[in-house]
Amino acid sequence: MPIRIPDTLPARETLLKEGVAVMTETDAVRQDIRPLQIALLNLMPNKIRTETQIARLIGASPLQVELTLVRVGGHTPKNTSQEHLISFYQTWEEIRERKFDGFIITGAPIEQMPFEEVNYWEELTQIFDWTQTNVHSPFYICWGAMAAAYHFHGLPKYQLEAKAFGVFRHRNLDLASPYLSGFSDDFAIPVSRWTEVRRADVLERQSLRLLIDSDDTGPCLLEDRARRSLYMFNHVEYDSFSLKEEFERDREAGKQIQVPFGYYPGDDPARQPLNRWRSHAHLLFGNWINQTYQSTPFSLDEIGQ
């Protein structure tokens, strides 16, 4: 089944060109089945880019999914037009009475700030708590994962001396995990962050299970079984050119930035980067969608009961 998104969402044209099945609202009504209700709290500056990346992965599922785009109300994005926000996004206050099968919270380029200094931290902690009663399975990404792990588990983040930036090898630590079904033993995932969580801190917390790890960049994916939550500290959702654009942006701004590790053939920025993580990105999101579908109540009203 395809993903259901607004007919005029900019991501729609991109997804159709890539062969992703996209459903009109008329077609969705005609099928007369309950789609999975998935919401995306998009904290990234380039919201159109991020919503396209997430919709691409969710839309590959054989299940019908309806995607709701959400933003925090206490922050006005500078890189996305008000017209786009008004047309396609709702604030959390506007959807807080609803229930969702899945809820994705993205990263944000504020990882070097203490959590409590983020101008929408209070609202975000309310959203975290709300997911425990109104969401069946939350999925946190990068800074969103660090923030949620700190909020729920007291897991600290640490400043890195240099940015972890590139495509790094990772290990599958749990072949039996349904979230890692089909994963190789060893695979590549993009990383782009100035902070880290540490393996020793994760292992001290019995409520967390380490599923994916890297010798180079540390813990990547955690599971909280009791809360049916996933914490992804890296950027498996990135498309082929995300790291390239970040590198060129920082270089043009005169910032100290190294060539992303393991990304360009021969570490030559003049060459076309190779996407070596696409299949595992689809596997992870597909497995999450499937697990959510298998365990969520048929009636949304029963979520949280």
Swiss-Prot record:
Subcellular location: Cytoplasm
Job description of the protein: Transfers an acetyl group from acetyl-CoA to L-homoserine, forming acetyl-L-homoserine.
InterPro entries to which the protein is assigned, alphabetical: Class_I_gatase-like, HST_MetA, MetA_family
Catalysed reaction equations from the record: L-homoserine + acetyl-CoA = O-acetyl-L-homoserine + CoA
Family matches, as PANTHER family: HOMOSERINE O-SUCCINYLTRANSFERASE
Gene Ontology cellular-component terms listed: cytoplasm
Annotated positions for site Important for substrate specificity: 192
SUPFAM superfamilies: Class I glutamine amidotransferase-like (SSF52317)
First-level EC class: transferase
Protein name: Homoserine O-acetyltransferase
Keyword Nucleus attributed: no
Pathway: Amino-acid biosynthesis; L-methionine biosynthesis via de novo pathway; O-acetyl-L-homoserine from L-homoserine: step 1/1
Keywords: Acyltransferase, Amino-acid biosynthesis, Cytoplasm, Methionine biosynthesis, Transferase
Primary residence: cytoplasm
UniProt-listed Enzyme Commission number(s): 2.3.1.31
